[in-house]
Amino acid sequence: MDALNKLKQFDAYPKTLEDFRIKTCGGATVTIISGLIMLILFFSELQYYLTKEVHPELFVDTSRGDKLRINIDVIFPHMPCAYLSIDAMDVAGEQQLDVEHNLFKQRLDKDGQPVTTEAEKHDLGKEEEGVFDPSTLDPDRCESCYGAETDDLKCCNTCDDVREAYRRRGWAFKTPDTIEQCKREGFSQKMQEQKNEGCQVYGFLEVNKVAGNFHFAPGKSFQQSHVHVHDLQSFGLDNINMTHFIKHLSFGKDYPGIVNPLDDTNVAAPQASMMYQYFVKIVPTIYVKGDGEVVKTNQFSVTRHEKIANGLIGDQGLPGVFVLYELSPMMVKFTEKQRSFTHFLTGVCAIIGGVFTVAGLIDSLIYHSARAIQKKIELGKAS
């Protein structure tokens, strides 16, 4: 018994008899409010505990031989698919080789709705195929270039050959209906059919992980003196409207919290023949999920520049949308980690103890203030 009596001396929570306890409406109100506050703060702390903690690291990128995946979904509401070409270039201006891609062109009407149910597969750097079967023609034939023959190009067996001959002469290609090769391939029919249409380009590119660019521009693309240019003589600069809507553009896979700054970017061209350049800085990124899955991807920042392109074959800039990218030598690594359970318990205890203590102080203040006021009222009545 003596031991138990001595143990009672350490009780930090002395109890009072039930008969000496006073319950008030103010105390009940404080209790209810403090209980609600405890619940709100508890669920807030629980939500914070259940979210993953992400630790960033920065180091030099030493990876070699990797490919860069570019995810594209861009709409050109006033540029027909038959006019639009897509090319990927390296930093030296040469067309990239060994580019894996899966790009599609979807024709759109004036309201932005698909004209056909199936999108057309696009071959990077190649012109659209004709509607006729070339195997039905004599392979040894030599057709006319309509006065544009040169020593290097004496025979023009396709519409593209005639266009190339005209380009070399510096002639405008404005009368395809009078050229047998173009009539046979349905060149004018295709152009006229899609004249007032738009085009949606979507899919992906996988290019070498070096600085370069990819672009969307009207006209046939070709190399001239080691410079990549487009032949626009058959279009006329006044007919080129490069208004565009970038639904999605990213470099690699998505990961939690990623921000793609060009998504849902809508740019209306103020006049014809505009050249838009997006200068992109890519930061290689590794994201390690809590289950150990590793996602290799990229983040990027972007700056836009625009100007009027006055050149017909690229000597003063080309109308189009150009994305010029370069890679940072640094790599960012994000690692997901589960938050500490002991920290969660500590936070919950701090919430309960803190709210309980503050509520007790408020209740005591309310009670003693009410008692003091009541006494003054009673003294006033007595006098």
From Swiss-Prot:
Family membership, please give it: Belongs to the ERGIC family.
Task: Read off the InterPro entries from this record.
Answer: Erv, Erv_C, Erv_N
Q: Does the keyword Transport apply?
A: yes
Give the compositionally biased regions (Basic and acidic residues).
110-129
Main location as per UniProt: endoplasmic reticulum
The UniProt function text for this chain reads: Possible role in transport between endoplasmic reticulum and Golgi.
Q: What is the lineage of its organism?
A: Eukaryota, Metazoa, Chordata, Craniata, Vertebrata
For the region Disordered, give the residue spans: 110-132
Q: Which UniProt keywords apply?
A: Endoplasmic reticulum, ER-Golgi transport, Golgi apparatus, Membrane, Transmembrane, Transmembrane helix, Transport
| Protein name per UniProt | Endoplasmic reticulum-Golgi intermediate compartment protein 3
Write out the transmembrane intervals.
26-46, 342-362
Instruction: Show which residues sit on the Lumenal side of the membrane.
Output: 47-341
- Which is one Pfam family of this protein? COPIIcoated_ERV
User: How is this protein situated with respect to the membrane?
Assistant: Multi-pass membrane protein
Q: Which PANTHER family does the record cross-reference, listed alphabetically?
A: ENDOPLASMIC RETICULUM-GOLGI INTERMEDIATE COMPARTMENT PROTEIN, ENDOPLASMIC RETICULUM-GOLGI INTERMEDIATE COMPARTMENT PROTEIN 3
Does Transmembrane show up as a keyword for this record? yes
This protein's encoding gene:
ergic3
- GO biological process terms, semicolon-separated: endoplasmic reticulum to Golgi vesicle-mediated transport; retrograde vesicle-mediated transport, Golgi to endoplasmic reticulum
Superkingdom of this entry's organism? Eukaryota
Query: Where in or outside the cell is it found?
Result: Endoplasmic reticulum-Golgi intermediate compartment membrane; Golgi apparatus, cis-Golgi network membrane; Endoplasmic reticulum membrane
